[in-house]
Amino acid sequence: MSLLVKAALILKCASMLQGVSAQYFCRDTTFDKRTLESVRFESECIPTVNKRDLDPNAEGVYKRSFDGNMNPSDFQLLPLAPRDGAIVNVDKESFSKRSTTNMFDFNFSCYFGSDGHSNDTLCQQYIDVADSVGEQFSRVLNLNTPIVIDVTVVGACTGESVCSQGQGMVAGSIGGEASPSREIPMACSDGLTRYYPQAVVKQLGLSDPPSYADSDITIALNADANFYFGSGDMGYEAVDLAYVLFHEITHGLGFSTGWGVFGYENLTDPYMNALLPTVSYVIGEMNGETMYAFHDVIENAFDRNIFYSIDPNEGLPTIAEFFHSVGAAFTLKADSIAGVVAQMNDTTTQFHIQANEAYRKAINPGRLVIYPDAGIDTYSPFIYLDSSYVPFSSGSSLSHVALHHYDCEPNFLMRAFYTAGATLESYIECAYGSDQADVAYGPIGPAMRTVFRRMGYSVNNLTGVTNEYSESLAKRSLSEKPKTAPTGKQLALHPLRRETSILDSTNTTSTNATNTTTTTSSSSTASSSASASSSTSATSGAAGDLFSVSKNLMMTLTAGLCLITASLF
């Protein structure tokens, strides 16, 4: 082989390795009003330090890129994840509905009509509703640092948009979408790394914080939706904007999964799907040999609350613990790659069978739950998450509570569907009925408060507090507060995005079109957006259920094999 050809081959192989890195990165999200979708990318916001500069007394935890004598010997200092947030008792007599400063700052950009013109009067209506929602959130969450939210109001065919006939997250939904603007990797007490939303990291008062994005939450709203702004008559097909904003802000604060469904092409099963969180891989050398290893498994802070079993006595570990136990042991020598690829392509292997079973369980309702820890909340032994979509939908699965369990119950807000023509107040009245003890929390139900606390937010104790929600409920007679859910047309708050599945006989191509991430070291769908995706349940809990290899890993292995082959000539 000529030197020119060999050089070209090596360059081609090296290009396949783009996206593989030994560093931790923050995950950022911005909204592209031309494509009407969120753009995901990574940014280097966590400082990297050299091994010789390690300070054992420094705040945080050092994560090594490689174990033993593997090179490079870079280390990174990850901030420590917060402990469970506190429950803050308040003076119930003085804690009036206007006693708390609004800790939410909204930056609105509004584009209306086909020319994308601004309408200050109409945009102000959005702002007024958002400020009211921010005030209520500020009464529930005990915040010490303001949370900045960028909100884009844009239609399906506005200004620079591609006018794509409903394609795009915002255009395809009545509400829109929301994501943390930046997610920061943090070292948790269980030895795992998880992505935490910037909004909660800012509350920790870190002495050496990572770099922060300009905003904490990014929200996009569909300007073509028939929004109700809280005054006048509400049409039977209108959508209460306050409801939508409460829902989207909750996603942006961290109520979203880092798990996604992945399809990768292999030789014998081109449409096999697998479920996994963000997985980083590294390539290095040890004793002169090229090595391929998992860098880390990184799920969202939200995912720490998710369990397979609805029986806490089984003591099953969390999703990440299953996967991490396998990933930590998965280190390949270069000469082993061909055999591993062949094994993954063999449909008779346990790996293939278990990955298939994992996907099946992910579309089985009632398998995935949030367990409140003892002392966090005693509201319920567990909270059902939504895993009812067949095929799996990264637009609605897991980042919402089960639809029919909570249609007239205090956790109603995080259902994936909204009843047209129903006001937020009608949902609250239905959820609480004659029980006014906790109605001051309004739409921020116990499931949300539990998740917020597990991520590190402090929550005010509003039991027995009087505010506009309790006052409104008190004005009605018991006969006017039936435990019946609002009726009307059911509208999806987020577009239902379907991934091709080996279980879906109607599809014959592998589509992961919703994966807008351009991350450099991970495989992930648009996991943290309000239309975030989901995960599976398994009462048996076999680690192999989650040891599912993404296309990124396949590319890594293939690229490594390519480089080895090139070096032989």
Swiss-Prot record:
- Extract the signal peptide range: 1-22
Q: Which GO terms of the cellular component aspect does the record hold? A: external side of plasma membrane; extracellular region
The keyword Cell wall biogenesis/degradation appears for this protein: no
Q: Which UniProt keywords apply?
A: Secreted, Signal
| UniProt keyword annotation of Zinc present | no
Q: Where is this region: Disordered?
A: 498-541
Please note every region of biased composition (Low complexity). 505-540
Q: Where in the cell is it found?
A: Secreted; Cell surface
What name does the UniProt record give this protein?
Uncharacterized protein PB7E8.01
Species this protein is from = Schizosaccharomyces pombe (strain 972 / ATCC 24843)
